Regions:
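Short helices/loops that flank or line small-molecule/ion binding pockets
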Residues: 90-101, 118, 171-172, 191-200, ...
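Helix-loop-helix "hinge/cap" segment bordering the ligand-binding cleft or interdomain interface
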Residues: 129, 148-216, 228-265, 329-337, ...
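Extracytoplasmic ligand-binding clamshell segments of periplasmic binding protein
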Residues: 89, 227-311, 444
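Hinge/lid segment of periplasmic solute-binding proteins
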Residues: 110-162, 307-308, 465
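Short helix-initiation/N-cap motifs at beta->coil->alpha
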Residues: 84-92, 110, 184-191, 264-277, ...
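C-terminal lobe and pocket-closing loops
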Residues: 293-303, 315-321, 329-425, 463-464
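Conserved N-terminal structural module of periplasmic/extracytoplasmic solute-binding proteins
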Residues: 2-114, 350-354, 438-443, 447-465
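Short, solvent-exposed loop/beta-turn-alpha elements that line the ligand-binding surface or hinge
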Residues: 44-45, 125-139, 182-183, 206-208, ...
Length: 465
């Protein structure tokens, strides 16, 4: 079982790869690619023609296919060719070197500022304006912020599947733990509840009391404690006092349940996506999950007893934290106009409504539960919920779904930084060494800050700031 439970984890994008990309990309180094069917970089037109090559978007399920079909039809007579494999920095480097980049790429939102800083993708403000879309209102604020760099928007966000606590009511009842004891605004109370629900057999965990998804969701917990991995400009702030407090709590939580290594080993043995998942087997008291995991659990809806709890900061404020992907247009794209039109249409209200209809049909065929779609767009989320999310016959799952929707009221994300991948990696490493006892939390974060700061100083923003 993976310790990182964001559905779409950030691609590993090393600085050396990006430097190579900048060196070999003609658009990033002052050259230009001859556009086909549109004007050049930064210029968009509704007069569509030529071929559109996309990379990273995979219409493998009904949600993706319905959106893709609608967008592909909208860009006609331009023809669409898809490379459905995930974005890969090395592959993109080779494409840039040959001058054959895709016209449209799908990437994790956290690396959009990195690509923008290196001049590898182009700002989309003119694209949005052409089609009458205001990203500030079309998408959740945190999603738009993630793809904004130096005041310009470089991506078209998709999905915002917020994190929440999903607890096993059977384990809670056996331990005498109530739902209000899982209030994350009271971190010491969480540790106490974890201790009550934790069980061991033969010196090894048999029930994890509270799994905070570490190090995968470390940044979420920094924000719970009022901290952040970076400042408003994207500069790393890993060694800030609030972050040290957060990591100290993470260590305390793990130590209260047999220690990080033992918990990780036990979690790795869990059948998280199968019919014998940890909620079926009552192997966990509570866990942090993205909204999408409700879909996984629905396959075993008759075997689990669960309750959802929203995540709050220590000052009691709701925290709807999520990552996600974005569509971006390479600077050297040959058909940016078709790419722009496709991306805007694929994330339009019409596209998400079509996706909602397609998901509803699948849910009906499988006799499953419709948990809604968390699209990244408030209007689309509401439209799909109003049309398709109805009482499921399971009070537990209705409560989970309602809780998930409630987390969208106040959105948050990792942030926007040209050194985002390096900051994320440094944080993950710091959490791992602190939880394992190799370093104390303050030292681990101090060392992580030094590593992340070096990466920041090699970005254009870092050199200029």
């Amino acid at each position: 079982m993976s310790t990182h439970r964001n559905k779409l984890s950030a691609a590993a994008l090393s600085l050396s790869v990006l430097v190579a990309l900048t060196a070999c990309n003609p658009a990033a180094s002052g050259g230009s690619a001859a556009p086909s069917g549109s004007a050049g970089a930064g210029s968009f037109s509704k007069d569509l023609s030529g071929s559109l090559k996309t990379s990273g978007f995979n219409p493998s399920d009904e949600v993706g296919k319905s959106r893709s079909d609608l967008a592909t039809k909208a860009v006609s007579p331009a023809t669409v060719t898809m490379d459905t494999t995930n974005f890969d920095a090395q592959k993109f480097s080779a494409q840039a070197a040959s001058g054959q980049v895709p016209d449209l790429i799908q990437v994790d939102r956290s690396i959009v500022p990195t690509l923008a800083d290196k001049g590898l993708i182009q700002p989309l403000d003119a694209c949005y304006s052409l089609w009458g879309v205001d990203p500030a209102t079309q998408y959740y604020p945190a999603a738009t912020k993630s793809v904004t760099y130096n005041g310009k928007v470089y991506g078209v966000p998709q999905f915002f599947q917020t994190s929440m606590v999903i607890a096993d009511k059977n384990v809670m009842q056996a331990a005498g733990v109530s739902t209000d004891q899982l209030d994350t605004s009271k971190p010491d109370q969480i540790v106490a509840a974890a201790q009550k629900m934790y069980k061991a057999s033969g010196g090894k965990p048999s029930v994890v009391g509270f799994d905070a998804d570490l190090p995968g969701s470390a940044d979420l917990w920094l924000q719970v404690f009022g901290g952040s991995a970076m400042d408003a400009n994207g500069k790393p702030t890993l060694d800030a006092a609030a972050n040290v407090t957060a990591l100290t709590w993470m260590k305390k939580l793990m130590d209260a349940q047999g220690g990080y290594a033992a918990i990780k080993s036990f979690k790795d043995s869990m059948d998280a996506f199968g019919n014998e998942n940890q909620y079926v087997k009552n192997e966990v008291g509570a866990q942090t999950w993205g909204q999408w995991y409700i879909n996984v659990l629905s396959a075993t809806k008759d075997k689990v007893s669960v309750v959802g709890v929203p995540i709050k900061t220590t000052d009691g404020k709701a925290l709807g934290y999520a990552g996600g992907t974005a569509l971006a247009i390479p600077t050297a794209a040959k058909n940016p106009s078709a790419a722009c039109a496709w991306a805007i249409k694929a994330t339009s209200l019409d596209a998400w409504k079509a996706a909602g209809d397609a998901r509803a049909k699948t849910v009906q065929e499988k006799n499953s539960i419709n948990t809604g779609l968390f699209t990244g767009s408030p209007a689309a989320d509401k439209a799909v919920r109003d049309a398709h999310v109805v009482p499921s016959g399971s009070a537990d799952f209705d409560q989970l779904i309602s809780t998930a929707y409630s987390t969208l009221d106040t959105t948050a994300s990792f942030g926007s930084s040209p050194a985002g991948s390096s900051i994320k990696d440094a944080l993950s490493n710091a959490v791992a060494v602190a939880l394992s006892g190799e370093k104390d939390p303050a030292t681990a974060l101090k060392d992580a800050q030094a590593t992340a700061l070096r990466a920041w100083q090699q970005t254009s923003a870092g050199k200029n700031g």
